[in-house]
């Protein structure tokens, strides 16, 4: 109920978590994974979060099949190390500065209403690291669906994805389409979809918190598959796993 609170926060030295099937709503960082290594997040619903998922100074966080409603997914890294840190030992429990990578973001569903204008996916690092950390934070970003109705009368699209490192003065670039992302980084979102759709055309009853898919979203032929151990943790069949977001495919 506190407007500036975090939801589920794994802070400092966590390893290889399997975190599935939950609903987080109305927090600043609904799921926060900080200074840690290894987590799989799947089957979550994030609603009205400043950041639905926030990954900070961590490595190997795999985010599969979650539903984001008016919520951003954010992966961040900065210069923080144990030397002269105000907590000292905290950064020493996680990956070193040059190891904060290896993330996966796949088969998620990100949907916004007309009032939401923020980017839906963010990878950010400060300018001071641009020359030293040149590899991307993620090893795979693919098969995600971004649904946002185009603003009436808008000549340009709203920001969709923030990418860093980038060859800009700020080390960050903001893109408004998946086509622009593929032009910049062809390996990203080869099977992603950007839809000009409202929440009411995607979900069974968004006004009532019913975020099951109204109709299946057709998958692309070569998009990533949900790993078997994650599918089993969710209790899904192989058919169920052909879905986007947190709710399984219902053949009926």
PLM regions and their residue ranges:
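C-terminal accessory segments
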Residues: 145-148, 179-252
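Glycine- and acidic/polar-rich repeat regions and solenoidal domains
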Residues: 1-207
């Amino acid at each position: 109920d506190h407007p500036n609170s975090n939801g589920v926060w794994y802070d400092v030295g966590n390893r290889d978590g399997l975190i599935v099937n939950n609903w987080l709503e109305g927090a600043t960082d609904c799921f926060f994974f900080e200074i840690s290594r290894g987590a799989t997040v799947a089957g979550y619903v994030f609603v009205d979060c400043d950041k639905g998922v926030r990954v900070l100074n961590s490595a190997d966080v795999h985010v599969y099949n979650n539903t984001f409603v008016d919520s951003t997914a954010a992966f961040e890294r900065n210069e923080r190390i144990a030397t002269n840190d105000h907590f000292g030992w905290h950064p020493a429990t996680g990956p070193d500065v040059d190891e904060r990578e290896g993330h996966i973001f796949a088969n998620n569903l990100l949907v916004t209403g007309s009032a939401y204008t923020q980017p839906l996916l963010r990878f950010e690092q400060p300018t001071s690291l641009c020359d030293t950390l040149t590899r991307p934070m993620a090893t795979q970003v693919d098969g995600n669906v971004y649904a946002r109705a185009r603003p009436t009368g808008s000549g340009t699209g709203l920001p969709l994805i923030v990418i860093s490192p980038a060859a800009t003065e700020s080390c960050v670039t903001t893109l408004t389409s998946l086509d622009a992302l593929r032009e910049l980084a062809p390996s990203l979102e080869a099977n992603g979809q950007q839809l000009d759709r409202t929440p009411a055309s995607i979900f069974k009853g968004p006004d009532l918190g019913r975020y099951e898919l109204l109709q299946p979203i057709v998958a692309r032929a070569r998009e990533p598959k949900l790993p078997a151990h994650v599918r089993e943790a969710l209790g899904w069949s192989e058919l169920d796993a052909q879905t986007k977001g947190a709710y399984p495919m219902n053949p009926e």
